[in-house]
Amino acid sequence: MPKPPLRDKVMKKKICIFCKEKNTQINYKDTTLLRKYVSDRGKIRARRVTGNCVQHQRDVAIAVKNSREVALLPYATVAR
């Protein structure tokens, strides 16, 4: 019995945008930047989806949580 073919396409590793552009700051008041890292359901996107490094993903998560606390970002949107 022949083996199934391996994946032809190799996924390219995403580069952390904050490491690439040194002048970009993560701030809880910058809602336009933070909305890129929040799904339409209000969940914080995973590191493998966003391509952030460990430290910057932590910083984004903390900034999103702080932004939710002061009501700049919603906790969740209407699902239905």
Swiss-Prot record:
The keyword Cell membrane does not apply. GO terms for biological process: translation. Keywords: Ribonucleoprotein, Ribosomal protein, RNA-binding, rRNA-binding. GO terms for cellular component: cytosolic small ribosomal subunit. PROSITE patterns: RIBOSOMAL_S18. GO terms for molecular function: small ribosomal subunit rRNA binding; structural constituent of ribosome. InterPro entries: Ribosomal_bS18, Ribosomal_bS18_CS, Ribosomal_bS18_sf. Part of the 30S ribosomal subunit. Forms a tight heterodimer with protein bS6. Binds as a heterodimer with protein bS6 to the central domain of the 16S rRNA, where it helps stabilize the platform of the 30S subunit. PANTHER family: 30S RIBOSOMAL PROTEIN S18, SMALL RIBOSOMAL SUBUNIT PROTEIN BS18A. Belongs to the bacterial ribosomal protein bS18 family. This is Small ribosomal subunit protein bS18A. It comes from Rhodococcus jostii (strain RHA1). The lineage of its organism: Bacteria, Bacillati, Actinomycetota, Actinomycetes, Mycobacteriales. The gene is rpsR1.
